[in-house]
Amino acid sequence: MRAPLRFHFARLLLRLILGSLFRVRLEGSERLPRSGAYLLACNHLSWVDPFLLLAWLPASPRIHFLGRRSAIYNRTWKRWVLQFMGGVIPVESGDIEHLSEAVGGALARGGVVAIFPEGKTGRAEGELQELRHGIAHFSARSRAPLVALGLAGTLELWRGKRIDIRVGRTLELHGNVASDMVAVDEAMREALPTYRDPGGARPWSWLTTLLR
C-alpha cells in the first residue's frame, strides 16, 4: 500500500524535528515483514509515540493508527497534521463493527495497522498494563500476522533524551482470544527495551506535556 507524496514529506519533516530533539535508536528493523499487511502492537507512554513510529519505521507498507477521536482530534493543529498525513482510524466508543471494517479495509489494501492495546498511556517505563482484546479479534478476522514493538524513554521527555524502539517477534494468531492474548502479552513484554534513568540535567522538560 503506497503512501501519497505528502506523507513522505511529512514523515521526513517529522524525522528531522524529532531527530533534532531526541537521540532515537531503532533496533530489530530486519524483523519487520517486507511486504504484505500486518498489525503492530506497541506499548504507549507519551503523545510522541505514534510520531516516532511514523518517522522511524519504514514508509511502506503504510502505517495506520487507531486512536480515540477525543485524543487525536483534541487540538486544531494536531487534527490538521493527522489529516494531512492520513492513515488515522478514529475510534468511537461502542462502534465496534465500524472499527472492525476500517481495520480490515486498511489491511486488505496491504497496509499496516498500529495499535496501542493497553488502551491508555502507561505510568512507568518498562511496564505493560493489561491489554484489551480487540487486537486479537482484528488479527483473527483478517488473518494478518502481528508484530510486537517496544518503546522506552518517552514517559518523560527532554532535549537530548535517548529513546529506544525495539521490534520484537512476529506472531501468527489462531482465533482463540484467551491464548492469543497471552502470546501477545508475552511478545510485547519481551520487546520492551531496558530503561535506565540517565539522571543529570533535563533541558526542555516541558516537552513531556507539550501535546497532551
Please place each PLM-identified region on the residue numbering.
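Non-catalytic C-terminal accessory region of glycerolipid acyltransferases
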Residues: 2-5, 36, 97-212
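Short, glycine/polar-rich helix-capping loops at beta-to-alpha or helix-loop-helix junctions
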Residues: 10, 73-78, 156-158
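Short, basic, glycine/proline-bearing loop/turn elements
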Residues: 13-14, 84-90, 119-121
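A generic structural signal for well-ordered alpha-helical segments
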Residues: 17-19, 58, 82, 106, ...
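Catalytic core of membrane glycerolipid acyltransferases/transacylases, capturing the structured
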Residues: 34-94
